């Protein structure tokens, strides 16, 4: 999630990691 997809989504969602 976030800008790097660090949470596993691999998109622009979730916490910005």
From Swiss-Prot:
One of its GO terms (biological process) is neuropeptide signaling pathway. One of its GO terms (cellular component) is extracellular region. This is Pyrokinin-5b. It is found in: Secreted. The modification Leucine amide is found at residue 17. InterPro entries: Pyrokinin_CS. Expressed in abdominal perisympathetic organs and abdominal ganglia. Keywords: Amidation, Neuropeptide, Secreted. The keyword Iron-sulfur does not apply. The keyword Transcription does not apply. Myoactive. GO terms for molecular function: neuropeptide hormone activity. Belongs to the pyrokinin family.
């Amino acid at each position: 999630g976030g800008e790097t997809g660090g949470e596993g989504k691999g998109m622009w969602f979730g916490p910005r990691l």
